[in-house]
Amino acid sequence: MTVDGTELTKLDEKRLREILNEVRSKSQMRLMSSGHTAAVSRATSYFSDVSYYNEITAGIDYFQSVEQWVREFDSKKGEIIAGLKRVMGALFTRDNMTVSYTADDQGFSFLPEAMKKLSQALPEGEKKTYAVKAPGIRRNEGFTSSSKVNYVARCGSFAGSGYPYTGVLRLLKVALNYDYLWINLRVKGGAYGCMSAITRSGDGYFVSYRDPNMKETNDIYEGIPEYLENFNADERDMTKYVIGTISELDTPLTPSQKGARGLAAWYSGLTDEMVQKERDEILNARVEDVRALSGIVREVLKTGALCAIGNEEKIKADAAMFGAIQPLYNGTASEDGQ
């Protein structure tokens, strides 16, 4: 592959080593600062194809692969380079190219020539889909580190359970994050924060942020269905939940953000009609609609996918929660929580 006469298939081994070290450093910093995101990614990768792809390209699995490449670069560099070339040749082809471009009319005037130039630089290739399948194994891992706090994620899916998606699930996120989870995890439990979501795909998660607890947090997640069955809120609180949900759904976006949202909608098949239906369900949500979500939450929890990142002593003290425990950095798995 050449661009402006420059051969792009030549790999400088010294520069490649530098890039791998940079990637390892940035990935490690991301895991340290966003342990809640990493824990959710890992737990949902057990059962979700999309999350599995995200995990092997940006999550803990990705970091540990890069870490191994750096550690074994001298003996494995030929294999690494061959693999990178194989991936580049399979993905970066004319037939596989999709372009998302956001600009005003003047900006669009540059697009045809730029795309022609880029297209000519790419090999024609074969339009091929590469299936990525989640392992379907509930590993339930604990990743240990020197951290004093924990990130505890409980994930699952209600897809295939017969329950339809509803916009009220967005309102549930607001209600949980500012009521049940906030009171039990933040106020009573001492966690710095808590997050949750159940998405249109059926995947859902509950996760704590900088949490001193482990098993106690998972027990709180288990109590969500009962909380919903007895859910009550007056008109003022329901209005507050609706406003909070709509403000998140209809947040003003920059042109770049609009382009990214549009591309995501295009890939997922999300239409304006589907978004409006979701908006209407939020605006018309009643207490009874929130109570009716207890079944969906039970299905999510029934999946039983769990991942925790944090303090080694705490994770080992609650080892019965996990199917495997391993160091987050430079480690190999220890099965059955040993």
Residue ranges and their predicted role:
Residues N96, S100, D105, P112-V187, ...:
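His/Glu-based metal-binding/catalytic segments typifying zinc-dependent metallopeptidases
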Residues N284-Q338:
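In a subset of proteins, long, contiguous C-terminal domains/tails are tracked
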Residues I80-M115, K302:
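Non-catalytic, conformational "gating/processing" segments within enzyme and secreted inhibitor domains
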Residues M1-S75, R94-A103, Y151-L171, Y180-V287, ...:
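M16 family metallopeptidases and their MPP-like homologs
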Residues M1, L111-L118, I220-I224, M321-G323:
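Short amphipathic alpha-helices in soluble, non-transmembrane regions
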Residues E79-D95, L122, A320-F322, P327-G337:
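Charged, long alpha-helical assembly modules
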